[in-house]
């Protein structure tokens, strides 16, 4: 038999969410934003809020970034309103056609919604 190791959806989302929240406007990895948005759109109904919250807490503890979580929504506002981040998203859209019709506002709303899901547990 072959063992296959895999992360569950909540862990994948939590790792990307933690990266977005802890790096804020220094995160140039637009793929994290896209992945978080598209995974939440495709699999949103299957996300278990308690599992997502636990995975986010565990990821933040492991990475030493717990201090960023209480200000997550303010960080989202800062990221969304950053002209540099919008420019990076526009460049990502031009490079990858699959993202061309997804607005920056829509992507950031997905980020906020996933964080709110953690708060609601």
Where are these regions (language model features)?
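Structured mid-to-C-terminal alpha-helical surface segments
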Residues: 1-121
